[in-house]
Structure formats: C-alpha cells, structure tokens
Design a protein with these regions (language model features):
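Glycine/charged-rich beta-loop-alpha catalytic/anionic-binding loops adjacent to active sites
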Residues: 1-7, 36-43, 93-97
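Active-site-proximal helix-loop elements at catalytic-domain edges
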Residues: 1-27
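Short alpha-helical scaffolding segments that buttress acidic/His motifs in well-ordered protein cores
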Residues: 22, 40-45, 78, 113
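Buried hydrophobic packing segments
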Residues: 22-26, 57-65, 113-117
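Acidic-glycine-rich active-site phosphate/pyrophosphate-binding loop
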Residues: 23-41, 83-91
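Phosphate-handling active-site elements
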Residues: 30-39, 62-77
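Glycine/serine-rich anion-binding loops at beta->alpha junctions
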Residues: 44-60
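C-terminal binding/interaction regions
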Residues: 69, 76-125
C-alpha cells in the first residue's frame, strides 16, 4: 500500500467517513486544511449522494487539482477503473441495499479510490 492509501484507510478506521478519509489523505495535493477537507466531505458522506462518497471525494481532488478538460478526462478514467473493479460507483449498489449482495465494503471503496487517485496523480498526463 502506498502512503496515501494507508492514510485514507487509517482515517476511515479511526471513524472518518469514506469521503473525509479520501479527502484528508489527499488534502495536500489541493492545498486545503483538515477543517476544509472535513467541511467539503460532509455532504458526500453516508449515502447522502447517489455516488459513493469515496468516489466523490476523489473526483473533488481531481477537479481541484486539474483544469477543465484534464480534470474531466481524469474523472472519466477514475470512474472507469473504479467500475471495472467494483461493478458500480453507486453507493446503494456497492452496499447491496436493494439486492442484499454487497459489491464492496466502504473501507474497500476508500482503499480503491485512494489507489486509483494516487495513480492518476502520479501519471500526470
């Protein structure tokens, strides 16, 4: 595991929401404080949105790190890879709320989001 994946998982283990865990692990990439990261993450957490909060947090980082077309391309790549791994980016589907079949745990989504995000940032093209 890379440092940012480890950080994200540790934040989640300590009680941070999925979105707060990912945003805090990568907050230095977009020059925001922990308070700003927690504030930005709050509306994304706990199934409040359709998409998984860990996915939304990663997209927030990409949107704030890159401009226009580059951000949109990286977000598209992120969603494609996350979906290939987990079959969905939709929180209800990942948690198996309607089907009873859990596709990925919240911690797994945090780890996957952090890993994919790290790769997209590292491959700065």
């Amino acid at each position: 595991m890379t440092e940012n994946i480890t950080k994200a998982v540790e934040y989640h283990k300590s009680g941070f929401s999925c979105s707060a865990a990912v945003l805090n692990a990568f907050r230095d990439e977009i020059s925001i404080s922990e308070i700003q990261a927690m504030s930005a993450a709050k509306p994304m957490a706990g199934g409040r949105m359709i998409k998984c909060g860990a996915v939304l947090a990663a997209e927030y980082v990409l949107r704030n790190k890159y401009d226009g077309d580059t951000a949109e391309r990286k977000i598209s790549e992120f969603e494609q890879e996350f979906t290939e791994r987990n079959k969905s980016v939709v929180c209800r589907e990942l948690k198996g709320i309607d089907t009873g079949k859990i596709l990925r745990s919240c911690r797994g989504c945090v780890s996957d989001s952090a890993g994919i995000l790290e790769k997209l940032i590292r491959d700065n093209v």
